[in-house]
Amino acid sequence: MKLNINQVNWPEAFPEKPEVTVEVNNNQYWLFLTYHVKGDQVRAVTTEDQGPVWEDSCVEFFCQVPGEEYYCNFECNCIGAMVGSRRKGRAEDVKPFSPDEMGRIERQCSFPREAFEEKDGLFEWSVELRIPLDLIFRDQKPTFPQKLKVNFYKCADKTKKPHFLSWHPIPLPKPDFHCPQFFGEIELR
């Protein structure tokens, strides 16, 4: 399925709206996410996993297995540096994925894995993620079709034009992606 990440939840403060889509596919072992982004600037300062990738040109995927109290967050900048964890909330019971778990997430980016400061201009870039389903389904094996609560995001906190786009709306007064109560739903097949 192909989804548009086009919700500008805070238009007065953060009106920037790059064009962003994500293609979602899976098999019995992997979740495949392919993001395509077209926007006016790009930044990639963070090169290490578990660093502040959200400050860069970043795409994100948060998900929760229905009935579980934890959700997972997968955040990847445009050169493939990632943050990943299981958690109950923004700062509640956060369990970062280990280096071995992070290493199992396969990434392919249209930019090489080299840091660069913000560049202005029109840029098109992509990020492909292959996430092992056992990182998401820790306590149970998925049975297909399998429902999953999710949201997809595009952000760039430290750029000249910061933005915070989502697939599913977030009706809050200020940006916060760590809100599983506002996740939408997809079905893995």
Model-predicted regions and their roles:
Residues 1-189:
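Structural preference for beta-rich elements and adjacent junctions enriched in aromatics
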